[in-house]
Amino acid sequence: MADNIKYRFIQNVGDYFPSGYFNDDFFDKVQKCAGVSKDEVSDICRPYVRLKQEYNDYKNFIINDRPRVEDAIKHTHDFHTRLLSILGYATDHAYQEHCIVNDETSPVEMIPVRHVIRQGGQVKMFVMEMQNLITIDDKEPAGLFEQQYDSDERSGQQKYAARQWRFVFNLDTEKYEISPAIINKAITHIFLLPEERRPHFILMLAGNTVFLFDKDKWAKGSYLQFSLDDLFAQASIDQKHRTHYALFHMLVCKQTLAAEGEMVLMDTIIEESYKNAY
């Protein structure tokens, strides 16, 4: 895993960006690709300064109120709504369309997707959610490779029953079942779908953590992982560090990953990263 202490909030897992590109002037490179001016950087950062307090309130609720799983999921979903809005994504009509994995089974196998973003008839991107990854009393929650949407009660793995998501989406269990239930396996399955149904990117929101998965890099074990705790901490140091908000935004906003009728900016950034890696 190639990380950079200057951008501690980003984990460049499996060299999503070549380590020679993900260095101390990474922000300048991304800003140049995005064509964003200094004044525009300031405008991008402003909503995140306000979001910090909302994030702290949300995190305090999770840690101090010890909510039921279903209430924690709902509060996490609501925080995600605020974050997605700042990132430029439409946030209404969540979970209106399932990702159907196998419609020849009974019940039909599906994966819950918060938002499906298309251009024409082509799926471009999924926005998905999982439970938060906030540590409570030094107890690590189930992560990307353990957490499940639903599970066999006899399994030794941590249980994430679909009923616990009932405040976010309702699942007709006679018609549908969540399969694959383990989240990283669900991601793999999505990236093996037929091309017209396969997203280029998946933005996975997990409360204090954001993941970006790419169909061209997932099989190689490469993805980006963002810590909101580290983002807010680093960006609050001084005015210079506040630009970390803009870097986060430029990497995962809708304009970068799913702009309408334009070349995907992230593809441009990745292309530049290989040209200038060494």
Which residues are covered by each model-predicted region?
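Short, basic/polar, glycine-containing "phosphate-handling" surface segments that engage DNA
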Residues: 1-70, 122-278
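Acidic-basic catalytic patches of nuclease active cores, encompassing PD-(D/E)XK
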Residues: 59-99
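Histidine (H) residue identity feature
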Residues: 75-80, 93, 98, 115, ...
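Active-site metal-binding core of divalent-cation-utilizing nuclease and nuclease-like domains
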Residues: 82-123
